[in-house]
Amino acid sequence: EARILSMLGALFLLIGLLPAGAAGPAQEFATGTLPPETLFLMLIASAIRAGVYPFHLWLLPRTRSKLNLSERLLDHMAPVLCGLWLFGWTFQLGGAALTLAPLVLTLLALTLLATAIAAWTAEDQLHYVTFVLIGSAGVAVLAGGLAHNPGPSGMFWATTAFALGGGLWLVGDQVWRAWGWQLPVSFGALALAGVPFTPGFLAQPSLSRLLSGGIVYWPVFLLYVIAQGILIAALLRSWSTPEQAGAQDLPQSYTARLMFASLALGLPLAISGILPHFTETLAGLSNTVAP
């Protein structure tokens, strides 16, 4: 399934360039102009690569085995990040105008609601973790489509929350199981939930456009609030009592890598939430914070 969906995504990109003519592949991501047909197919290809519901099948675990941290980080988060940035470029080329249609936003909110329900009702940790990350990516797509500055800049904070917050949430869960130390998993979960002083909070002004855009967007906002509430409720399961492995049962090199990963993810996550302008300058982007 993963290979089939990956091939379909690439095929949509190739087909999407046909209406753009001979100059289609030469379009610049920042200043190019593409026809609606190309933008639509690029959005589909982005959704497949980002694993947004219902194009998430290639991300689902094949077994009910225990969580493999490396597999979730490399096989899930890395390709999804590529898909989110492809979404950003597509939005900048004009795809955001297609996304702002009330029907499209309603579909995005409904898919986010379905993902949140799946995360809440997941019976095992592996599916639970997978659907929480899929839901977080869905929030990033919705925020990017509504951003005041469509493009990679508009998706920067939601994508940062997914990458750093989601990564710390995964690593922190293993830290908690090893030592009973809750701070890393808690910080990661709070970043995914979008609380103040985290990059996820800086993406909230984009989502608030659903309230200021007119009454036609209010049902979409209601769907989003319900979906986000369920997703946050699912994140609260992060504080349920884990199966303690015990640090003495784990190799010393593994525990050292967990500690290093927690610091490597937690430090930039804290800096990005507290010093957003410094972070956007460091990333080489501008106008990422909503006015």
List the predicted regions and their residue ranges.
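Interfacial segments of multi-pass membrane proteins
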Residues: 140-147, 204-221
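Membrane-interface alpha-helices at helix entry/exit sites of multi-pass transporters
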Residues: 1, 66-77, 178-179, 215-226
